[in-house]
Amino acid sequence: MHLGDLKHPNELHGLSPAQLEDVARQIRERHLQVVSTSGGHLGPGLGVVELTLALYQTLDLDQDRVIWDVGHQAYPHKLITGRFNDFDSLRQQHGVAGYLKRTESDFDHFGAGHASTSISAALGMAMARDNHGESFKCVAVIGDGALTGGMALEAINHAGHLPNTRLLVVLNDNDMSISPPVGALSNVLNRARLSPPMQFLSGSVEESVRHLPFMGGEIPAELNRLKGSMRRLAVPKVGAVFEELGFTYMGPIDGHDIGEMVRTFQAAHREGGPVLVHVVTKKGKGYPYAEADQVGYHAQSAFDLGTGKAIPSSKPKPPSYSKVFGQTLVKLCEQNSRVIGITAAMATGTGLDLLQKAVPDQYVDVGIAEQHAVTLAAGMACEGLRPVVAIYSTFLQRAYDQLIHDVGIQKLPVTFVLDRAGIVGADGPTHQGQYDISYMRAIPNFTVMAPKDEAELQRMLVTCLQHDGPTALRIPRGSGEGVPLMEEGWETLPIGRGELLREGDDLMIVAYGSMVAPALATATLLEEAGLSTTVINARFLRPLDQALIHPLARRIPRVVTMEEGALPGGFGAAVLESLTDQDINVSMLRIGIPDKLVDHATPQQSKEALGLTPAQMAERILERFSNTSGDLPASASIKALQA
């Protein structure tokens, strides 16, 4: 069978072991071929090929529900549910998404991108099923890293209290999330992983008893009670944990042995309540480079299949904002033992891997636990430490109550570095950092800022650590502007003071963070069109530099704000509210991300689709103000000027 000809995943039912091995080979080949060409998540999907095939052998995918936690390990699922031939478009604009989307396939029952949501969703579906009197199966597949998230543990706590609700949780245990998982639960899983494979009465022994002539296919109550007693004696410590929480535990089993998994899943489906099957897999299975470096090959840009090495870009790039942040924090930690870097399982992505290597005693990884990370930092600050919490903008959303309740209200000196703020590209709407401006500006006592370049990032980090109160600093994904950097001796910035970059009389642009450089480029185009333009680097969202902005707004009749974030409640709204409160009436245009989701594409494609390139913004400015003011200079279009 060629997977390109597969019409429905149920067609895989009844394939021989040899045929299933061939299907597994095709999945890995296609997975590697596409990701090596266009980039994407590599290790997670390679590790669950056999798990996916075995699980789907035991399900009717016309009706049963499978919820994949996070979704980056679901490439094999996509390849056998109708997307094999279109997989070349993975993570590309208008192509196959890198995560699961309910709008993409009827087999994608629940969308995701953040960790630890699958058990809650699957339990909700199971409860709805029972409410409707239906009988389909509900399965959550979750990794050992995601299992450490509080939401997953909350769902397990609830499901274990519902002994008659059929739910299967498949624990994909590869001893990894993006980085190696941390914590006591991870240690327990590791000990179970090293124990001999367990054979339970609910598996092969039960099958033998069921087929005895005098049993008639039924398992008497006495044997069921014996089975429960034997299981409690036999399961490893991790199994005892889940058993005490109300789950039937099976495992650990080999996650690359299709036959063993099929038998175990079949036994699990026969149970009448919540079941957890513990499956041990190898991240990156089948590709030696990914098996050897499971962190580095979690996700990859384009790479050479033969050597495993990344294909270099056509020209050198400046260091990323994340790297500059990490390098600067290392220096600051070396100078001050009270400074502590905290990550929630994203050390490499945020640049804190540099701190982990250089000053490990001042580095903390809490696992996938953003809420805990924030309040842990609050506790540290109470006792005189200066914690720096580095979290992606999209993931900090998960700890909003802690930002307000535990840090903001108490005015604690915790610094938050919001990485991947703004448009992030191919990961799509679950990962865009478009909301942090709106959600951070609403929290009292916070000082919130964003640098125009990587040198200003260094000064802002020092400013945060010397400020007696909570601070937040947003940085974009990708390379900096290529400006010179200082090794040390960074000066602080005055809190709430912006920067006047150029002066003009016709128009004022107030730009925030990553939009400062595009604002300057836009101003150049407007000058060529005859529009004299002032440009301000706002630097601070809270407090806004009213002393700089207000006098200029009284003199300049047109104001444009630029931000790489959501317009509702955003930076432009802050400027507009500030002007309105002082009865400063101007013609205004707010440029940013409109009230919509930003789908997967390259960052440049997304910016073009949103009208955020300098040429597009200049055109829009001319169009906006030529409709409201007759005194603008006549000019050709920006496109014509660029030609």
UniProtKB/Swiss-Prot annotation:
Gene3D superfamilies documented for this protein: 3.40.50.920, 3.40.50.970
EC number(s) from the headed UniProt entry: 2.2.1.7
Cofactor needs: Mg(2+); thiamine diphosphate
Signal peptide: none
Class of the enzyme per the UniProt entry, highest EC level: transferase
Pfam families: DXP_synthase_N, Transket_pyr, Transketolase_C
GO MF terms, alphabetically ordered: 1-deoxy-D-xylulose-5-phosphate synthase activity; magnesium ion binding; thiamine pyrophosphate binding
Pathway field: Metabolic intermediate biosynthesis; 1-deoxy-D-xylulose 5-phosphate biosynthesis; 1-deoxy-D-xylulose 5-phosphate from D-glyceraldehyde 3-phosphate and pyruvate: step 1/1
UniProt cofactor note: Binds 1 Mg(2+) ion per subunit.
PANTHER family: 1-D-DEOXYXYLULOSE 5-PHOSPHATE SYNTHASE-RELATED (PTHR43322), 1-DEOXY-D-XYLULOSE-5-PHOSPHATE SYNTHASE, CHLOROPLASTIC (PTHR43322:SF5)
Recorded family membership: Belongs to the transketolase family. DXPS subfamily.
Function of the protein: Catalyzes the acyloin condensation reaction between C atoms 2 and 3 of pyruvate and glyceraldehyde 3-phosphate to yield 1-deoxy-D-xylulose-5-phosphate (DXP).
The protein's name in its UniProt record: 1-deoxy-D-xylulose-5-phosphate synthase
Provenance organism: Synechococcus sp. (strain CC9605)
